[in-house]
Amino acid sequence: MSNILGLDVGSKTIGLASSTGNVAKKEINLKFEEWNFEEGVSLLTEFIKDKSFDTFVFGYPKNMNGSIGERAEMVDYFIEGFMVYNPEIKEEQIIRIDERRTTKMAKSIMIEAGLSRQKQKENKDTLAAQLILETYLEKIKK
C-alpha cells in the first residue's frame, strides 16, 4: 500500500493525517498567517521533504448542493501553489475528497470524548484530516 497524506486546508491552518495501510493517524497541525497560502505551502513542503508520500488527499469542501464554492476554490488555489513548489508531484497524485461535514463530525467526536474547548481547537483540523483520509481509504477499499 502507498504512503498517503490527508490534508484539511483552512485559511490559517492545515490539518495533516497519514496512512501506509488501512488506518489513518493524526499527524500535526501547520499554522500560518491567515490567508498567507505561500507560507502554508512552504510549511507543508518542509513537512513532506524527508517523507515519501505518493498520494495527497485534500478535503474538498463542496456546497451542500454539491456545487463548487469559495472554500473549494481556496483549496484549488492552495493545491496549485503546492504543485508549483513541488514540481515532482504530479496531478494524478492529488486527490480531492468531498469533505462536507467533516469538521462538524470532528467537533462532535471531541465533545463526546470530553475534550476541553482548548483541546478541541487544537485538534479539530488534524481530526478532520484523519476523517478525510479515512473516507478516501474506505473508497479505495471497495
UniProtKB/Swiss-Prot annotation:
An MF annotation (GO) of this entry: nuclease activity
InterPro entries for the chain: RNaseH-like_sf (IPR012337), YqgF (IPR005227), YqgF/RNaseH-like_dom (IPR006641), YqgF/RNaseH-like_dom_sf (IPR037027)
Enzyme class, UniProt record, top EC level: hydrolase
Localization of this protein: Cytoplasm
Entry keywords, A to Z: Cytoplasm, Hydrolase, Nuclease, Ribosome biogenesis
Cellular component, GO, one term: cytosol
This protein's name: Putative pre-16S rRNA nuclease
Species this protein is from: Mesoplasma florum (strain ATCC 33453 / NBRC 100688 / NCTC 11704 / L1) (Acholeplasma florum)
Source organism phylogeny: Bacteria, Bacillati, Mycoplasmatota, Mollicutes, Entomoplasmatales
